[in-house]
Amino acid sequence: MRFDFEREKSRDVKQKHGVSLRDAREIFDQVYVVDQKSGNPEQFRAIGWCRGRLCSVIFEVRHDSEGEYYHLVTAWKATTQEEQSYAQNV
């Protein structure tokens, strides 16, 4: 699985939410829950483990000459509602 994100945005997200987009890639290495977040552009939310805590990441599925990759948009420590959703769906 390939990932892409803006480095400056990753630094901003880490300062604001305590988790970088680089760290958020870990979510996809384990069991995670996905739902659709918005339709235009089509974005998804994944909830899973990252740096020893539940986190959420918003991503877009994109394509290039090498195939499919995930463009990470933002991430944060999972809310109580997201923790419950994860627990109910794994």
Predicted feature locations:
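Ribonuclease/tRNase effector modules and their secretory precursors
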Residues: 1-90
